[in-house]
Curated annotation (Swiss-Prot):
It comes from Arabidopsis thaliana (Mouse-ear cress). Component of the oligosaccharyltransferase (OST) complex. It comes from the Eukaryota. This is Dolichyl-diphosphooligosaccharide--protein glycosyltransferase subunit 1B. The gene is OST1B. Glycans are attached at N106, N298, N352. Belongs to the OST1 family. GO terms for biological process: protein N-linked glycosylation. Residues 458-464 are cytoplasmic.
Length: 464
């Protein structure tokens, strides 16, 4: 705890020294409102900005700054330009990309937001920014018994970190319950129920930073998938086979002492409040042949609900998960090929499927998606709305001659917001669909010829 406060102090000192001799900015933030949701272990922050160009030249972009304690846990940043008011408000997505600044103070991280059109001198633009943080709630105490609730720390700043002068700003922090052990008070600040309000603060210089710490109760399931490998195998004969291998852990306060299943079943509201014994996976519609198993075998404690827009699989591991406990399991299912495989205007075929993890409110530390293309596929390419690591592999299956091309997509720090469609394009000649049937027919024909020859060949040494 003292070490964290020391790091914050050094960070603030460096920011003040940098801002003292920063050059004048062409932009300023007229008003900023930030709302931070701490209801689950995935921290969501909604930032509303009104930006003004106070320079003499048009501005085509602006910077969003994040402290080093957040940049390493930043899962996603999105920005929208807004026009109109209330029901007539329209939203236009903006291009947001990570960037580096040579004079960044103390490892501050930046994202560059490009405006739809350059912002002229004296003009203003309204933006709405969403950024998501993972692993930002620190359990304290770090170990709890089965009967104790989970308390966590959240570290942030009462004012937003920005390379621009901020005329007025307010921060609202929402906790999951009214139990708040303590919070840093930076006047004006007040707390009402589940909400803590910091501000309004006026005329804060660039790179202002006022650290705050909130200690509160959070018993939401800290479900963390250490590694998820999803294999999507395309068969032009009628279906997609999806196999998902999970290595799941509870990322909250570690469990100490003995586990009593009797207390867990009879006193569910107070025993193991931060544990979880069931998970919900949102699967595509029209799924079939669904199975759920672990190292021991199939698990029957699952319920599948199918619908027109989605399917939901609710299942229970063999034992409830407390802090520090882990479980490994596999989910598999099939979906109709015609729902996800299409033909582009240039003749190429492409798979349109959902990226991310089907489990609700789950962090995935490492996600690997393997798209297994039919044998004979060429020129594969993947299209995604964000950056991922890509590579090609080869997989051999039954009756394969040259193997099947596998498009491998890998991304770290994945959250539910990443569950968006992606496409994999490839070229395929229909003649290749006859390769495996031809091999089977050829094999049966050779066996038939060999059998026929064996019957008619005389192997006797002496002629009868």
């Amino acid at each position: 705890m003292a070490a964290r406060i020391g790091i914050f102090s050094v960070f603030v000192a460096v920011l003040l020294s940098i801002s003292a001799f920063s050059s004048a900015q062409d932009l300023q933030i007229v008003n900023a409102e930030r709302r931070i949701d701490l209801s689950s272990h995935i921290v969501k922050a909604f930032l509303t900005l009104k930006v003004e160009n106070i320079g003499k030249d048009p501005a085509a972009e602006m910077l969003l700054a994040f402290p080093p304690t957040q940049i390493k846990n930043l899962a996603m940043v999105q920005a929208l330009a807004t026009t109109g008011k209330k029901k007539k408000k329209t939203y236009l997505p903006l291009d947001v990309k990570p960037t580096e600044q040579p004079d960044a103070p103390n490892d501050t991280g930046y994202y560059r937001v490009t405006f739809i059109s350059p912002l002229g001198p004296g003009e203003t633009v309204s933006l709405e920014v969403l950024y998501i943080l993972t692993h930002s709630l620190e359990p304290f105490p770090v170990e709890i018994t089965q009967s104790e609730s989970q308390l966590v720390y959240y570290h942030d700043s009462a004012v937003i970190l920005s390379p621009y002068h901020v005329k007025q700003q307010t921060t609202f922090i929402k906790t999951p319950s009214t139990r708040v052990e303590s919070f840093t008070s930076i006047e004006p600040a007040n707390r009402a129920g589940k909400e803590i309000k910091y501000g309004p603060y006026e005329n804060r210089a660039s790179y202002s930073y006022t650290p705050v710490i909130i200690h509160f109760e959070n018993n939401s399931p800290f479900a963390v998938v250490e590694e998820l490998v999803r294999e999507i195998e395309i068969s032009h004969w009628g279906s997609l086979q999806i196999t998902e291998n999970y290595r799941l852990t509870h990322g909250g306060a570690r469990h100490k002492g003995v586990f009593s299943r009797v207390d867990y079943q009879s006193k569910r509201s107070v025993s193991g409040a931060s544990s979880f014994n069931a998970l919900l996976a949102v699967l595509p519609p029209r799924v079939n042949s669904v199975y759920y198993r672990d190292e021991i075998g199939n698990i029957s404690t699952s319920h599948l609900r199918t619908g027109f827009r989605k399917s939901e699989l609710e299942f229970e591991p063999r034992y409830p998960l407390f802090g520090g406990w882990s479980a490994t399991f596999i989910i598999g299912y099939r979906v109709p090929l015609e729902d996800y495989l299409f033909e582009a205007s240039d003749g190429r075929r492409y798979l349109n499927f959902t990226f991310g993890c089907p489990l609700v409110e789950t962090i995935v530390n490492k996600l690997t998606i393997k798209v297994v293309l039919p044998e004979g596929s060429k020129d594969p390419s993947a299209v995604l709305p964000f950056t991922v690591n890509q590579e090609l592999q080869v997989k051999y299956s039954y009756l394969d001659i040259v193997g099947r091309t596998v498009v491998v997509l890998q991304k770290d720090n994945v959250v539910p917001t990443h569950n968006v469609p992606f496409q994999v394009y490839y070229t395929f000649k229909p003649i290749y669909m006859l390769a495996e049937p031809f091999m089977l027919v050829s094999a049966f024909f050779l066996v038939f010829v060999a059998s026929l020859a064996y019957v008619h060949i005389d192997l006797n040494i002496v002629r009868k």
